[in-house]
Amino acid sequence: MIRRILFVCSGNTCRSPMAEVLLRKKLARHASEWAKDTVVTSAGVSAISGSSASENATAAMKHKDLDLSEHQSRLLEAADIINADLVITMTRNHKKAVLALVPQALHKVYTLAELTALAELAHAKPEQAKKYRDMIQEVAQKTMELTLLLDQLLGNPPDIEDPFGGDLAEYEECARSISGHLDTLLQYLDQSQNQSQDQSQDPPQESSHSRDQSAED
């Protein structure tokens, strides 16, 4: 089960804090029980800890009735990655930086666009959703081939562009892009969590030895 989601960008002042508060809002409105228990955080691979969210990121979120005025940036640490169930980066370079810190986290680190592409595949062919997830897991074990194979599978999805230094319109566009990805991601997480719950509730399979023993009794 996914309980802890970590967003990662560069300075933790623009993209990842916007993604953090946007997803928190979407989870709060979501009806599923799992959403209520999910913890969302963010950090930056090159952040200066204690910095405020950028002025335009704060303004863009204010337009969505979200408050970033109290946000303080955090430098990404290995413990953040280890403790997270899912690590979502804004770009492939951020993903590489995460894996440089914790290589064994390969199976749970994706760019936001990669996850969206996977979610769309699962939505289009729900009967093959598990197949796609298993395929991603298998690919994740092959570090050297990961980027190439994911690009082939997901169509080389684009990164979330950094609006730092841009005007408010660029921040608004970045927020719209992140929000759209998160809507698709939320559908995928809901489907994935429901499948996990169904599997955990399946009765244990009776072994052939037990059936044979019962037949002899």
Q: What is each model feature region?
A:
Residues 1-196, 202-217:
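Short polar/charged helix/loop
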